[in-house]
């Protein structure tokens, strides 16, 4: 069963919050910068002067809020394969359709709905 059953989708967007509420940008920034939780900076770079090593495999996050709506950011966080089937970005809020998942992680998402909304709220501020 999909975790997103009942959510409306636009072509490249999930317009509605996964939780029904706005996320917290400060918590979202902490998730993006945390190398144990989001791992975003493994591939992305952005406005994180305190982080020495940032990725160069994926787009810079500096102006992501100017390039995408909150719904478009949310879709890319939930499962960017819906937008780009060739992406290497993990699906942060899907729990099905993966190969070779360790037993402890089966049926679980990388981030919770609340964490997704926090990251969306933060990334939307990057203009």
Model-derived features with residue positions:
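Bacterial N-terminal signal peptides
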Residues: 1-4
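Electrostatic cytochrome c docking/interface patches
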Residues: 11-35
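Gly/Gly-Pro-rich "capping" loops immediately C-terminal to redox-active cysteine motifs
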Residues: 19-22, 31, 45-79, 88-102
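Sequence context surrounding c-type heme c attachment/ligation sites in exported
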Residues: 26-41, 54-55, 108-114
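The canonical Cys-X-X-Cys-His
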Residues: 28, 36-47, 73, 119, ...
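Glycine-rich, acidic and aromatic/proline-enriched surface loops and short helix-turn segments
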Residues: 37, 79-83
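C-terminal capping alpha-helices of c-type cytochrome domains
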Residues: 75, 92-127
């Amino acid at each position: 069963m999909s975790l997103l059953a009942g959510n409306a989708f636009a072509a490249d967007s999930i317009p509605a919050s996964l939780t029904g509420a706005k996320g917290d940008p400060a918590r979202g920034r902490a998730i993006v910068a945390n190398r144990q939780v989001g791992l975003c900076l493994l591939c992305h770079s952005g406005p994180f002067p305190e982080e020495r090593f940032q990725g160069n495999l994926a787009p810079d996050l500096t102006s992501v809020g100017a390039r995408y709506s909150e719904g478009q950011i949310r879709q890319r966080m939930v499962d960017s394969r819906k937008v780009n089937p060739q992406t290497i970005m993990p699906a942060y809020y899907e729990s099905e359709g993966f190969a070779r998942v360790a037993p402890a992680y089966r049926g679980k998402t990388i981030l919770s709905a609340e964490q997704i909304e926090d990251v969306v709220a933060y990334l939307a501020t990057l203009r």
